[in-house]
Amino acid sequence: MTQKPEELPTHDVAGRFAAPIDQTPHEPAHWEKEADAIRLLLADKKRQIFTTDESRRVQEALDAETYWKLPYYERWIHGFSSLLKEKGVLQEAELVTEEARLRATGEDKVEDPPGHHHHHHDHDHDHDHDDHPYQEDDDAGIAVLSPLQLRGRAVRNLLVARGILSAEEIRAQIEAMDSRGEHLGARVVVRAWTDAGFAARLAADAGAAVEELGLSRGETVLTALFNTPAVHNLVVCTLCSCYPRSVLGRPPAWYKSRAYRARAVRDPRGVLAEFGTQLPEGTSIRV
């Protein structure tokens, strides 16, 4: 049974937001890349400290005002720091102590070159007006990390000190994500276009097929969808912005945005047109 929009949980934005989709490319700030890396490492097969579902549970328990106020990766920091405390890996007192040390030593300062402003490119906490797809950038020009950004740094330091993560692992994870992107997806598509056998293997087992090209299948099931003249596929995650990171890297800002996650479900044809894809009326769209 379909719920009325006002009855949907805060985090499930399907169909509830009509703003335009901001397609402006944005380069992640270092603290965002680091939060992304820490979250993935803590949940990997080596450590298995928590699951994606547990991380979602903590974030989805936030009240609506807080949920939409926090930038995407600050919600991630809230999620993994809360779970580390819940599971007894870290204690609140030691986090507070480390945060105080960081402030005392000046390590709570934003380290950007003069005149550079990084953006919360993955804001999906848009206000409810159609002409404002992203909240105004709130760290451009500031000099101090926000409380959750500082907590992320404190978590990192404590995990490294205890040997749960290493600085090298975090750096390698960031570099791995930096190296992935649309160019790798294009390699897969071109190979499928030019090699019917590979296309068949890609359809049957996308993870194994991309490994033929030296790419990673990742730790989740990778699936390839094939467009035809009759059916065009549009992929969206209305809950947590799931994305084929093992090939494409970090999801772009527009994919995580509140506008895309809401409108792709309700108006897929309009969303595709906004990205420059005009489909014949006879082509079905599968979301």
Q: Which residue ranges define each predicted feature?
A:
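Short, amphipathic alpha-helical interface elements at domain boundaries
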Residues: 34-39, 44-46, 57, 169, ...
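Compact alpha-helical subdomains of small soluble proteins
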Residues: 55, 63-75, 79-94
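Amphipathic, hydrophobic secondary-structure cores in small proteins
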Residues: 51-58
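Short, hydrophobic/amphipathic alpha-helical patches that form generic packing surfaces
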Residues: 34-44, 75-86, 153-161
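Short, surface-exposed polybasic-aromatic patches that bind anionic ligands, especially phosphate groups
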Residues: 15-18, 22, 32
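Terminal, compositionally biased segments used for targeting/anchoring and flexible tails
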Residues: 5-16, 26, 68, 83-85, ...
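Non-catalytic ligand/cofactor/substrate-binding and regulatory segments of enzyme domains
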Residues: 2-3, 7-10, 14, 38, ...
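Acidic, low-complexity/disordered tracts enriched in E/D and polar residues
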Residues: 23-27, 43
